């Protein structure tokens, strides 16, 4: 249904932006790669890439506290996001944001319970992309 809706919106001239998240429960690096392939077929105009964070007061916090979810390390989140970023940009899809905006609400004391948060996450991803294999 989602693929059909995106195609229909594009037919009517809408600019399509997609948001991709790494580190979702049950997600593997292989499933991230498969998602990127689907996104490339959809051909959005732009995309955003975010790592999943455990935020205070959310259902995910309770799942995390019960030990049923382990967030990505910062290193794994950077590597997976760099893969997504490089694939999208090589395909001509503009990536307009990588990582969450480090605002006062998000960065308030105790708001981020766990996960790969870094105020310069996007720069880490771009640096990773520029490293030699």
Residue spans for each PLM region:
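C-terminal scaffold of the Radical SAM
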Residues: 1-133
């Amino acid at each position: 249904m989602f693929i059909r809706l995106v195609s229909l919106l594009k037919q009517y001239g809408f600019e399509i932006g997609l948001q991709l998240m790494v580190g979702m429960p049950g997600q593997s690096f292989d499933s991230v790669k498969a998602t990127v392939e689907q996104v490339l077929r959809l051909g959005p105009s732009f995309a955003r890439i975010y790592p999943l964070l455990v935020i205070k007061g959310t259902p995910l916090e309770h799942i995390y506290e019960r030990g049923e979810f382990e967030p990505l390390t910062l290193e794994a989140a950077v590597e997976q996001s760099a893969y997504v970023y490089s694939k999208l940009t090589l395909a001509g899809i503009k990536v307009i944001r990588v990582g969450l905006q480090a605002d006062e609400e998000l960065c308030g004391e105790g708001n981020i319970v766990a996960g790969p948060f870094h105020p310069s996450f996007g720069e880490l991803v771009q640096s990773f992309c520029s490293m030699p294999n």
